[in-house]
Amino acid sequence: MQYHDQSLQTLKLGKKTEYISTYDRTLLQAVPRKLNRDDLGISTKQPFSFGADIWTAYEISWLNLKGVPQVAIADVEIDYQSENLIESKSFKLYLNSFNQSQFENLQQVEQILQQDLIKCAKGQVKVRLNSLQNYAQQPIATLQGECIDEQDIEILCYEFDPNLLENCTNKQWVEEKLVSHLLKSNCLITNQPDWGTVQIHYIGNQINREKLLRYLISFRQHNEFHEQCVERIFCDLMKFAQPEKLSVYARYTRRGGLDINPFRSNFEPIPLNQRLARQ
């Protein structure tokens, strides 16, 4: 993908912007998934059959019909088959536009959010607004699996290198869930760091954990959006490890009141949106 692609030049991300506090759906901006998928060779057919970009929006507020502020937390699922992903700063600005606008009730806001996101993503989107009372009952979760981070290895290079996965399997057939908290990449536009925890669930020849960790650490200076990184990890593992079944799930830390948690799989459904310790 060309980072200077014209479709990225119009994004508000990385630019000084005005904060609008009256509802305006035109603030939402899309990024074509095709940009990254062309580079991965999966624009026509994706190697995953289940997936979504799972967002949590913590800063949602509007006025009721009497002018009293209301607040909620949103769970949003944007289907992996949608034509576009949603650019995060535009999503933040769009949500801010609800702040001084009046709506009848939570259900009306939820419906408007869903309609607008569907139009921007050009695909299926699910939205659920949660009261703070309900959300407070959600515990801090952990991604199931064996953590691969405590290996006694030396890292000298932090440039992205998929070839670190070359010859990464042995002949032992296993089902494993492996977890790393060391995923870090950078925003495609602003170069700001994106911190994440990634879970890899697979059935196939056993993956060498040292090679996998070196590969994940190689994202440390790589510039891509969250969703693109997860699809790249999925494609690289399918190429080098060739598992029979594979899921890749990353949960990223919050920025601007939003966290993004992409999930891609060729065999299991989308997980519940459960926040981790860093979220």
UniProtKB/Swiss-Prot annotation:
GO annotation, cellular component aspect: cytoplasm
Active site feature: 187 (thioimide intermediate), 194 (proton donor)
MF GO annotations: preQ1 synthase activity
Gene Ontology terms: biological process: queuosine biosynthetic process; tRNA modification
Residues that coordinate or bind NADPH: 88-89, 255-256
Record organism: Histophilus somni (strain 2336)
Family stated for the protein in its record: Belongs to the GTP cyclohydrolase I family. QueF type 2 subfamily.
Protein name as catalogued: NADPH-dependent 7-cyano-7-deazaguanine reductase
Enzyme class: oxidoreductase
Compartment annotation: Cytoplasm
Catalytic activity: 7-aminomethyl-7-carbaguanine + 2 NADP(+) = 7-cyano-7-deazaguanine + 2 NADPH + 3 H(+)
Keywords attached to this entry: Cytoplasm, NADP, Oxidoreductase, Queuosine biosynthesis
Subunit details: Homodimer.
